[in-house]
Design a protein with these regions (language model features):
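Alpha/beta-hydrolase superfamily serine-hydrolase fold, recognizing
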Residues: 1-290
Length: 290
């Protein structure tokens, strides 16, 4: 299968489901720089919009810092419904782990990152890394499609950026807005989750409080200080629930910054990227010493 390329990235197939192929935009470090590890970037878009190109601002800079970044396309609303997207994230992690071995990255472990709804999906996938796969799943590996017996989506850490970690609570907040933003968030939420019950089921706080999870990955949450999209209370509730469950939850707030501020560039965007690289470096350094 022919790859699409530029000077900075290559677009590759990584997943096939029922003859539908999904692509990853792979950002690689400069040839003179050793690859530290492979990251999977899950795009946002209120579970329905955007694609693998959305996070290019930080994906490119992460590559320059030594990380191979696999920015993925995946099934999302309105064509597909929960939990298809998080299941695809697990498949992407499985693929990225194979890639890390193939390119001989310094670390063979994979960390997921995600912006907005992509952060929610990355967290949900990380907490359910062995979700039941579907018949007909194929992974692109060694220049051919293969059908793995099982998918391992486990990761040691997740970076979630201004993520709506409780879809039901965010849906109720969107209802209260009575404006174009609120209507878009409500429409997209229903398009992907179909019901408020499914939104509640997908709450990260509910998962860590009510379900038995094999592993609680470390979380770094980047919070926009002036987020009109995700209320701070939703994030605070997860922070409390995650720590109560025994997980490590780190949060960095960017005062005055709006939802998705990194995409606009500027000083706050650059600080966010520096913070992200520092956190990733610390994660992989700690993993290598254990």
């Amino acid at each position: 299968m022919e790859a699409m390329m530029s000077d900075d990235y290559v677009d590759l197939p990584y997943l096939k489901r029922q003859d539908e192929t999904y692509f990853v935009r792979l950002w690689s470090p400069p040839k003179s720089v050793e690859t530290k590890a492979v990251l999977v970037d899950v795009h946002g878009g209120a579970w329905c919009d955007h694609d693998r190109k959305a996070g290019y601002i930080y994906d490119k800079q992460l590559a320059q810092a030594g990380y191979a970044v696999a920015a993925i396309d995946f099934r999302c609303g309105p064509a597909f419904q929960h939990p298809t997207a998080s299941i695809d994230v697990n498949a992407a992690v499985h693929w990225a782990r194979l890639l890390a071995r193939h390119i001989q990255a310094r670390s063979q472990e994979v960390v997921t990152i995600g912006s907005s709804s992509g952060g929610h999906l990355a967290l949900l996938a990380a907490l359910t890394p062995y979700a039941e796969e579907e018949h007909g799943t194929e992974i692109w590996a060694k220049d051919e499609w293969t059908s793995p017996q099982s998918i391992d989506g486990s990761v040691p850490a997740v970076g979630a950026f201004w993520a709506p970690v409780d879809p039901a609570a965010r849906f109720m907040y969107a209802k209260s807005l009575d404006n174009q933003l609120g209507r878009r968030l409500m429409t997209n939420s229903i398009a992907y989750f179909e019901s408020e019950e499914a939104m509640r089921e997908a709450s990260i706080s509910r998962v860590v409080s009510e379900e038995t999870t094999a592993r609680l990955p470390r979380i770094w949450f980047a919070q926009a200080g002036n987020d009109q999209n995700v209320p701070a209370e939703i994030v605070q509730n997860l922070e409390q629930a995650y720590r109560t469950a025994g997980g490590v939850f780190e949060i960095t707030t960017y005062p005055g910054s709006p939802h998705g501020f990194v995409h606009a560039g500027g000083e706050a965007s650059q600080k966010f990227i520096r913070d992200l690289v520092s956190w990733l470096d610390a994660i992989f350094e700690a993993r290598s010493s254990t």
